[in-house]
């Protein structure tokens, strides 16, 4: 897709060849596995990692077989891929693939029809567990980044809290534990040599104050063309 941030980046940076190697649904643990492969095969000058909300806890949750996940005691562990009935059906239908991969329709149905009752204590415990898992993921991810930075430059791109921006908040919403993980990851990564951090929250906020245009689609939270364009420009400015 020529409108994705990596395609625009490839066009903007004539002296670089940009290769997107990410897979939809993969967490930061999988990012490191792919980066290790790329480092050994292609010896790139620069790695760019885009971190989004579900990267933290899903690095341990083993939600999607076929990916690498962090092991609590060791490094990365590959979970063998065994396609479910839904995925086998999705292979036969482009529409089902769209529902399953892009809109995560199973999760949406679970939210609508789920029987779980959320209490204050339950939410507090879930937030605490989320932070604990996320901090472990950050620690292991940064350890991998330190290794990569010995031979290559690294840019870590942090997605912005777009809902907070649309609501008029100046900073990330501190009531969302994922924003604590973003902040902690960014602060720690800045201390690693050859590593730069771009916090897209500030980039998106400046753009929204100027033009009052959303960076995502009305039906899901994926970036739209404007979101990709803004992210690619921030990367271009940093690399140049």
In which residue ranges do the predicted regions lie?
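Structured segments of extracytoplasmic/periplasmic soluble domains
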Residues: 11-12, 38-41, 50, 148, ...
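Membrane-embedded segments
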Residues: 1-56, 228
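Catalytic His-Asp segment of secreted/periplasmic serine-dependent ester chemistry enzymes
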Residues: 163-240
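Short, amphipathic alpha-helical "lid/cap" segments that border enzyme active or binding sites
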Residues: 28, 32, 135, 139-142, ...
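Short, glycine/charged-enriched secondary-structure capping and boundary segments
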Residues: 2-5, 33-36, 61-65, 169-172, ...
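Second-shell loop/turn segments in exported
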Residues: 20-21, 131-132, 217-221
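Loop/turn elements at helix/coil->beta-strand transitions in domains of secreted/extracellular proteins
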Residues: 14-17, 43-47, 150-155, 192-195
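Serine-dependent acyl-ester chemistry module
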Residues: 53-187, 200-206
């Amino acid at each position: 897709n020529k409108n994705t941030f990596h395609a625009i980046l490839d066009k903007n940076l004539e002296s670089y060849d940009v290769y997107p190697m990410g897979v939809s649904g993969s967490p930061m643990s999988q990012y490191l596995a792919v980066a290790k492969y790329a480092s050994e095969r292609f010896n790139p000058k620069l790695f760019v990692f885009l971190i989004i909300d579900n990267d933290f806890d899903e690095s341990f949750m083993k939600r999607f077989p076929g990916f690498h996940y962090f092991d609590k005691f060791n490094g990365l562990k590959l979970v063998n891929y065994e396609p479910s009935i839904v995925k086998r059906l999705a292979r036969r239908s482009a529409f089902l693939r769209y529902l399953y991969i892009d809109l995560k329709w199973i999760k949406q149905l679970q939210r609508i029809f789920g029987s779980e009752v959320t209490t204050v204590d339950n939410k507090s415990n879930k937030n605490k567990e989320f932070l604990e898992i996320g901090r472990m993921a950050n620690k292991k991810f940064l350890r991998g980044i330190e290794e990569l930075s010995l031979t290559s430059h690294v840019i870590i791109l942090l997605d912005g809290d777009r809902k907070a921006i649309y609501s008029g908040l100046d900073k990330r919403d501190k009531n969302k534990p994922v924003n604590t993980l973003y902040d902690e990851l960014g602060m720690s990564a800045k201390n690693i040599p050859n590593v730069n951090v771009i916090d897209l929250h500030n980039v998106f906020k400046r753009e929204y104050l100027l033009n009052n245009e959303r960076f995502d689609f009305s039906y899901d939270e994926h970036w739209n063309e404007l979101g990709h364009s803004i992210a690619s420009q921030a990367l271009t400015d940093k690399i140049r």
